Amino acid sequence: MNFAEAADGVELAWTSEGEGEPMLLIAGQATSMDGWGPTAELLSRYYRVIRFDHRGIGHSGRGDAERYTTRRLANDAAAVLSAAGAESAHVYGHSMGGRIGQWLAIDEPQRVRTLILAATSGGRMPDSAAEPDSAAEPDKAALDALVSGDLARLEPLFFDSEWARNNLEATHTFFNSRASAWAKARHFRASREHDAWSELGAITAPTLILHGTEDRLTPLPNALLLRGHIARSVLVRVPGAGHGLHLDHPGTVEWIRQFIARRSG
């Protein structure tokens, strides 16, 4: 394990495996780098995979509350890239990690070769003057389950039941990152307050949007909105997938490989 130093001096734990073009994995809220589990292993067969713990999570330091915004967390991601000796990378963000990836692509476009956004959104609805698109909002039961932390309620929102039964270790690791209640609350707030709609047009990196058709935490209309706001984007709908499609649908790895190969050729 290695440590990068963030702008405010906080140490950020990171690791890498594999060889080839660098790929930075950005986890969702309150999820450690270990939560990428089998997906990181699959990707490391083709890329140099760089993973890290967000501030307040796992082996990383905490820092001040004011640093917990998706835009500032993108600065942390950039610090990890620098520490890893990667001037640029393919950036793959899941959920809040996708929100962080958006800011990295907006603020430091030279560092993002391609952008992969899984189960994420641009934040609050783009037209505040209009009625919000209720179809894009998480349903109340799903949001209540997320806040509760009850694994029995959370697991079906993320994973196919058969996959979860056959991947007990990966499921356990994903839901059991080391994090204080203080850090979890800051991550939740950062994710919920994310709003990048007005700046998504600045993203120049080729972008692959992966989204499950049954995602109740970040419903599919969010992906359609992202597709409309990011010029060089492609949307792949994953039939039957929930919020954890980055793990329980390993076929997404091949789609990512094909997407990167076409953009790099």
Question: Which stretches of residues belong to each language-model region?
Answer:
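Conserved alpha/beta-hydrolase "acid-adjacent" motif
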Residues: 216-222
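Conserved HGGG/HGGXW glycine-rich cap/lid loop of the alpha/beta-hydrolase fold
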Residues: 6-61
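Conserved alpha/beta-hydrolase catalytic His-Asp/Glu region
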Residues: 149-199
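Short beta-strand/loop motif that positions the catalytic acidic residue
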Residues: 203, 209-211, 215
